[in-house]
Amino acid sequence: MFHLRTCAAKSVHKSWDIFFRNTNAGAPPGTAYQSPLSLSRLGFYGLHESDLDKSTRFEEFLQRGRLNVLANVIRYHLGMYHRRSSPYPTDVARICEEAFTRRQILLPFRKPLIVFTPKSLLRHPEARTSFDEMLPGTHFQRVYYDLTRAKPVWYAGRKTHLTELQRFLDTAFDLDAFKK
């Protein structure tokens, strides 16, 4: 599982207050909705521009330990209500799902929403969303996490799992491929 470093709650409280003061003083209306993480405020979150470049990988981002302030703000102010905001969408429809964009707008606080997804994953046939799922009368499927039964999992980032799944399906009934 992911282990996030912690620091003193007092410094987190001070940093969070500074963030709100700066946002209220300098951000034009609606900016928080359009771009929750501006490049000018990356330093506050412990992030650097290199963390958000085109080749950033989700695993490397978590290993760098840049989310320590965010994790402490969650623990200190919200009582584990909102765990993290670094989603990894599995298809195009999930980017606009309640767990991503809608939740970000409806929450009473602002926190960076960092979305990792490769372009090739969004173009993959298995990741496509049909228009039938977006018609009037449909709704988003909710996902509830039962953290009391959390277990360590293996994580395959980027398009690795789709590539491996396709390789498995191509060779599932071809016994000669397994003899090699």
From Swiss-Prot:
It is found in: Mitochondrion matrix; Nucleus. One of its GO terms (molecular function) is oxoglutarate dehydrogenase (succinyl-transferring) activity. One of its GO terms (biological process) is tricarboxylic acid cycle. InterPro entries: 2oxoglutarate_DH_E1. Calcium ions and ADP stimulate, whereas ATP and NADH reduce catalytic activity. The modification Phosphoserine is found at S40. Keywords: Glycolysis, Magnesium, Mitochondrion, Nucleus, Oxidoreductase, Phosphoprotein, Thiamine pyrophosphate. GO terms for cellular component: mitochondrial matrix; mitochondrion; nucleus; oxoglutarate dehydrogenase complex. The keyword Mitochondrion applies. Thiamine diphosphate binds at R64. Its EC number is 1.2.4.2. Gene3D superfamilies: 3.40.50.12470. It comes from the Eukaryota. Its cofactor is thiamine diphosphate; Mg(2+). The keyword Mitochondrion applies. The modification N6-succinyllysine is found at K14. It catalyses: N(6)-[(R)-lipoyl]-L-lysyl-[protein] + 2-oxoglutarate + H(+) = N(6)-[(R)-S(8)-succinyldihydrolipoyl]-L-lysyl-[protein] + CO2. Disulfide bonds: none annotated. Homodimer. The 2-oxoglutarate dehydrogenase complex is composed of OGDH (2-oxoglutarate dehydrogenase; E1), DLST (dihydrolipoamide succinyltransferase; E2) and DLD (dihydrolipoamide dehydrogenase; E3). It contains multiple copies of the three enzymatic components (E1, E2 and E3). In the nucleus, the 2-oxoglutarate dehydrogenase complex associates with KAT2A. Interacts with ABHD11; this interaction maintains the functional lipoylation of the 2-oxoglutarate dehydrogenase complex. 2-oxoglutarate dehydrogenase (E1) component of the 2-oxoglutarate dehydrogenase complex (OGDHC), which mediates the decarboxylation of alpha-ketoglutarate. The 2-oxoglutarate dehydrogenase complex catalyzes the overall conversion of 2-oxoglutarate to succinyl-CoA and CO(2). The 2-oxoglutarate dehydrogenase complex is mainly active in the mitochondrion. A fraction of the 2-oxoglutarate dehydrogenase complex also localizes in the nucleus and is required for lysine succinylation of histones: associates with KAT2A on chromatin and provides succinyl-CoA to histone succinyltransferase KAT2A. Belongs to the alpha-ketoglutarate dehydrogenase family. This is 2-oxoglutarate dehydrogenase, mitochondrial. It comes from Mesocricetus auratus (Golden hamster). The lineage of its organism: Eukaryota, Metazoa, Chordata, Craniata, Vertebrata.
